[in-house]
Curated annotation (Swiss-Prot):
It comes from Mus musculus (Mouse). Catalyzes the reduction of the C14-unsaturated bond of lanosterol, as part of the metabolic pathway leading to cholesterol biosynthesis. Plays a critical role in myeloid cell cholesterol biosynthesis which is essential to both myeloid cell growth and functional maturation. Mediates the activation of NADPH oxidases, perhaps by maintaining critical levels of cholesterol required for membrane lipid raft formation during neutrophil differentiation. Anchors the lamina and the heterochromatin to the inner nuclear membrane. This is Delta(14)-sterol reductase LBR. Keywords: Acetylation, Cholesterol biosynthesis, Cholesterol metabolism, Cytoplasm, DNA-binding, Endoplasmic reticulum, Glycoprotein, Lipid biosynthesis, Lipid metabolism, Membrane, Nucleus, Oxidoreductase, Phosphoprotein, Receptor, Steroid biosynthesis, Steroid metabolism, Sterol biosynthesis, Sterol metabolism, Transmembrane, Transmembrane helix. Glycans are attached at S98. The Tudor domain may not recognize methylation marks, but rather bind unassembled free histone H3. Residues 73-90 have a biased composition (Basic residues). Belongs to the ERG4/ERG24 family. It catalyses: 5alpha-cholest-8,14-dien-3beta-ol + NADPH + H(+) = 5alpha-cholest-8-en-3beta-ol + NADP(+); 4,4-dimethyl-5alpha-cholesta-8,24-dien-3beta-ol + NADP(+) = 4,4-dimethyl-5alpha-cholesta-8,14,24-trien-3beta-ol + NADPH + H(+); 4,4-dimethyl-8,14-cholestadien-3beta-ol + NADPH + H(+) = 4,4-dimethyl-5alpha-cholest-8-en-3beta-ol + NADP(+). The keyword Membrane applies. The lineage of its organism: Eukaryota, Metazoa, Chordata, Craniata, Vertebrata. The keyword DNA-binding applies. PROSITE patterns: STEROL_REDUCT_1, STEROL_REDUCT_2. Residues 52-117 are annotated as: Disordered.
Length: 626
């Protein structure tokens, strides 16, 4: 392996891409695999340069005229006309000893010509917009990531957000990839793409809009992984529900016998599910609740969201109470639970197909950063980032409304069915704990609905099969598995053991809520005196990473709290079977995978600052374990 010539922190001169100009830069890091140095210019720009494009400071002689600029953002066009030119840069210098005979008007023409040549040289730099993947969520299934322990003091400083053009430069770039200058002449189609990255409007102030590139490094195993997930998840839901209905749901009786096809389909059940979905959509459209703005998109826009999830939950609860009072048979949902899950699955597939077809006509800047250009993968991950019908945001609505509120409704039905089947005058203590724990989780998510706007689901992932199936099928029908299990497999829970489980639940909830609240408070106002005791690491993006408090304990304290709560609402089911613990097993695997995605993205975005953060906070989720 070739030895490195420069070390981190060393100040050197780096060649500006596509030109012969060298500027003062600081070495941030070195990639042994690609043999590229990550450097930072004085204006904050970070590039990857080859070693041949970096020179030590001593190899440059300082000129009195200051012909070598200290920052790539400084242009010679801003110099005073009376300042003498560098000998190497003078376009028309008279022989030594002679007097300049050029008129003032001719001098201006020569200077203007020189400025145009320099601008044309710099504009030939090949530009590759870098889309940094935002992520994090503090509610529901997916919870906050370290990404949102940050606060950007300058709202549009990030390269993926709005970039303001100076009157002097008339152009801007986001992230660059250095190419040999022999390749500056490209095909016409490449040149036309570059023109989209340069703003040349006559207005003194312009806005540069970055288009959303498509990913090349596919997640979830790429296309084969997406196909397996799309086939495997519906089969998994079906097998779980069938197994739970058996008298003995142990592993020795797996797989369960499959019912006849006519038992899996009933048109009336489909009508019930559609009614539920559209009633929740109607609640979402009610003009009540706060209207919040989302994070800036790549073109600088901020979408508006109506935050009335808690109102929808209250209206749903009132409607259910009225239904019970009027004698509506809610047990219908239990007796047709399997058909209801299949109806929701079919609806999610049709919704995913609609979303993909409509995304084919969506502008490029509205596509998801996770999209790839492959039809199968994009159907799975989602091609359009924020599909909307007018002001109705389909992805935001499905994240918390039909599935999460439906989860609570299913739990209530299971509680009523336990009393009916087991001939109880009151629900069992185990059923009460399961319902109470999960109700608290859902209400907390709806109460903090605004935190969803900074989640990976909203900011990064498109709306496709992955989120549609997860929100509409996976959450309500697998997260309610403990209550479904207790209907046919009762478990008598003693009060001392119940007290321990309650304490465990409260411990997990305190960690989960305090970590997310601390993160959200720091993101909104990092100068809050209440947060003055927290230590941070500043990053080159202008944001800071928390390295004390809950976020100095582990990198994902909210994940830790989430997993403790998941264990607490599985324990009331006892230890006779493994089935009630499916959620904690699945959720652990999900959060470990999610943490790995977050780690990869943060390392690319923050570079050396993220390395320092990992040294300060070595444990990812489980302290002293992982």
């Amino acid at each position: 392996m070739p030895s490195r010539k420069f070390v981190e922190g060393e100040v050197v001169r780096g060649r500006w891409p596509g030109s012969s100009l060298y500027y003062e830069v600081e070495i941030l890091s070195h990639d042994n695999k690609s043999q590229l140095y990550t450097v930072k210019y004085k204006d904050g720009t970070e590039l990857e340069l080859k070693e041949s494009d970096i020179k030590p400071l001593k190899s440059f002689k300082q000129r009195k005229s200051g012909s070598i600029s200290s920052s790539p953002s400084r242009r010679r066009g801003s110099r005073s006309r009376s300042r003498s030119r560098s000998r190497s840069r003078s376009p028309g210098r008279a022989p030594k000893g002679s007097r300049r005979s050029v008129s003032a008007s001719h001098e201006g023409d020569v200077k203007e010509k020189k400025e145009k040549e320099m601008r044309r040289e710099i504009l030939q730099v090949k530009l590759t917009p870098l889309v940094l993947k935002p992520f994090g969520n503090s509610v529901s299934v997916y919870n906050g990531e370290p990404e949102h322990m940050e606060k950007n003091a300058t709202p549009y400083k990030d390269k993926q957000e709005r970039i303001i053009l100076s009157t002097e430069d008339r152009y801007i770039v986001t992230q660059y990839s250095l190419r040999p200058r022999r390749e500056e002449v490209k095909a016409k189609e490449i040149e036309s793409e570059e023109q989209n990255l340069v703003t040349k409007g006559p207005a003194p102030l312009g806005t540069f809009q970055v288009t959303t590139p498509q990913r090349k490094d596919l997640e979830f195993g790429g296309v084969p992984g997406a196909v397996l997930i799309m086939l495997g998840l519906p089969a998994c839901v079906l097998l779980l529900l069938l197994q739970c209905r058996q008298k003995d749901p142990g592993l020795l009786h797996f797989p369960p016998p499959l019912p006849a096809l006519h038992e899996l389909w009933e048109p009336r059940v489909c009508g019930v599910y559609l009614l539920w979905f559209f009633v929740q959509a109607l609640f979402h459209l009610l003009p009540v609740g706060k209207v919040a703005e989302g994070t800036p998109l790549v073109d600088g826009r901020r979408l508006q969201y109506r935050l009335n999830g808690l109102y929808a939950f209250i209206l749903t609860s009132a409607a259910l109470g009225a239904a019970v009072f009027w004698g509506v048979e809610l047990c219908y949902l239990y007796t047709h639970f399997l058909q209801l899950a299949l109806a929701a699955t079919g609806f999610s597939v049709l919704l995913s197909a609609y979303l993909y077809v409509r995304s084919l006509r969506a502008p490029r800047e509205e596509l998801s950063p996770a999209s790839s250009g492959n039809a199968v993968y994009d159907f799975f991950i989602g091609r359009e980032l924020n599909p909307r019908l007018g002001a109705f945001d389909l992805k935001f609505f499905c994240e918390l409304r039909p599935g999460l509120i439906g989860w609570v409704v299913i739990n209530l039905v299971m509680l009523l069915m336990e009393m009916k089947i087991q001939e109880r005058a009151a629900p069992s203590l185990a059923m009460i704990l399961v319902n109470s724990f999960q109700l608290l989780y859902v209400v907390d998510a709806l109460w903090n609905e605004e935190a969803l706007l900074t989640s990976m689901d909203i900011m990064h992932d498109g709306f496709g099969f992955m989120l549609a199936f997860g929100d509409l099928v996976w959450v309500p029908f697998t997260y309610s598995l403990q209550a479904f299990y207790l209907v046919s497999h009762p478990h008598d829970l003693s009060w001392p053991l119940a007290s321990v489980i309650i304490a465990l639940k409260l411990c997990g909830y305190v960690i989960f809520r305090c970590a997310n609240s601390q993160k959200n408070a720091f993101r909104k106002n990092p100068t809050d005196p209440k947060l003055a005791h927290l230590k941070t690491i500043h990053t080159s993006t202008g944001k800071s990473l928390l390295v004390s408090g809950w976020w100095g304990f582990v990198r994902h304290p909210n994940y830790l709290g989430d997993l403790i709560m998941a264990l607490a609402w599985s324990l009331p089911c006892g230890f006779n079977h493994l089935l009630p613990y499916f959620y904690i097993i699945y959720f652990t695997a999900l959060l470990i995978h999610r943490e790995a995605r977050d780690e990869h993205q943060c390392r690319r975005k923050y570079g050396l600052a993220w390395e320092k953060y990992c040294q300060r906070v070595p444990y990812r989720i489980f302290p002293y374990i992982y």
